[in-house]
Amino acid sequence: MSETHLTNQKFADFSLHPEIQQALVESGFEYCTPIQALSLPILLEHKDIAGQAQTGTGKTLAFLVATFNHLLTTPIPDGRQLNQPRAIVMAPTRELAIQIAKDGELLAKHTGLKVGIVYGGESYEVQRKVLDKGVDILIGTTGRIIDYVRQGVINLSAIQAVVLDEADRMFDLGFIKDIRFLFRRMPDANERLNMLFSATLSMKVQELAYDHMNDPEKVEIAPSEKTSKNITEEIFYPSMEDKMRLLLTLIEEDWPEKAIVFSNTKHSCENLWAHLEGDGHRVGLLTGDVPQKKRIRILEQFTKGELDILVATDVAARGLHISDVSHVYNYDLPDDCEDYVHRIGRTGRAGQKGVSVSFACEEYALNLPAIEHYIQHSIPVTNYDSEALLDDIPPPVRIHRKHSPRPTGRSGGGKPQGGRPGARPRRHDRTRRHS
């Protein structure tokens, strides 16, 4: 569970079920983040909330604690059947659902409550077998949940707690009809605890909340501060000819411990992966076309430090909770201002420092004014010395074939294959020319 800066509010001060308190202590959670400190007092009084909070603010722990506590302190509905979960958590992406389920297991192992997860891209029958054994808390994407509802595998008439996470992205991805379909199959709003979280509480998100929740209380966390003060931002204006060389040079100079490179299209991400892989980096690729099992494996490798760089589109990376990301590179400036905030919010978490490097190239530079207006500050410009860029870049690898590690041919060194080297290549940090 990712954390941000903490408050003086302790979890121990809340009237939580003893098993929840034990789970929090053993998991190392003592102090609340702002969203937890504001939302839990409301939720523990069995009141609904609509919370505005970015990824990385601790909202996942907030709604999981509230959900588990509600189920442990509320009688099980009379006549509840094995195929009737008591709580449901809806997420816009498979990766987010998987992360929520992993976090939920930290609480589940202390409480005896069973967590089940369902999402597309994995075996329908394998997931069904888990559901057939009965789950208390169902976590998943709306499409797969609807499949099981229509087949009678699960029944939502015993739901006592509902979480809708990243509601704004649900709208972006066109899932709102699915959400309304599921809400109509649950008990009335006043018979359950309802929680909605969103990066923005737009009018359409608020309308959804008031349609399907019981007079929710609005909770907002620092709405005026879109980006963390822990993140150092800078922007370059590269030519299209220099763009790839600049990225490879900066990565070699910065030598990030764990970095995510964002691009706007699948094709561009594949091209980036091919060049980074060809340059000897340990890099993974996340786009919508990557099979689910491979996506999970790549994320595990990145989390464990077996990969140093992850190349991703916004949709593929939405909802990821990965700790210790030191650098974010925006190879393309996003078309959506909120995506810029989501991207750079992958770094600078838990009080750590982070670095965000953006490229305003000829194709996407027009997106910059809107982004700076949205984040309410200008991004410092860094010039670069084009003559200092790498000029001996190996050719990109082919994305559709397996390849053996090859030695780097760069005279200045290069990343050895097979593991993170102890020192970066011997190249002077002379590309940046600060104004």
Swiss-Prot record:
Q: Where is the Helicase ATP-binding domain?
A: 40-219
Q: What is its main location?
A: cytoplasm
Top EC category = hydrolase
**Coiled-coil intervals, chain numbering:** none
Which key words are in the record? ATP-binding, Cytoplasm, Helicase, Hydrolase, Nucleotide-binding, RNA-binding
Under catalytic activity, the entry for this protein gives: ATP + H2O = ADP + phosphate + H(+)
* Binding site residues for ATP: 53-60
Indicate which residues form the motif Q motif: 9-37
Enzyme Commission designation? 3.6.4.13
- Entry keyword annotation includes S-adenosyl-L-methionine: no
Subcellular locations according to the entry:
Cytoplasm
Q: Which GO terms describe its biological process?
A: RNA catabolic process
Domain of life, source organism:
Bacteria
- Gene3D superfamilies, per the entry: P-loop containing nucleotide triphosphate hydrolases (3.40.50.300)
The keyword Hydrolase belongs to this UniProt entry's keyword annotation: yes
**Any one GO MF annotation of this record:** RNA helicase activity
Q: Quote the InterPro entries the UniProt record gives.
A: DEAD/DEAH_box_helicase_dom, DEAD_box_RNA_helicase, Helicase_ATP-bd, Helicase_C-like, P-loop_NTPase, RNA-helicase_DEAD-box_CS, RNA_helicase_ATP-dep_RhlB, RNA_helicase_DEAD_Q_motif
Task: Return the motif ranges for DEAD box.
Answer: 165-168
The record's listing under PANTHER family reads: ATP-DEPENDENT RNA HELICASE RHLB, ATP-DEPENDENT RNA HELICASE RHLE-RELATED
Recorded family membership: Belongs to the DEAD box helicase family. RhlB subfamily.
Know the name of this protein?
A: ATP-dependent RNA helicase RhlB
Query: Which species is this UniProt entry from?
Result: Shewanella loihica (strain ATCC BAA-1088 / PV-4)
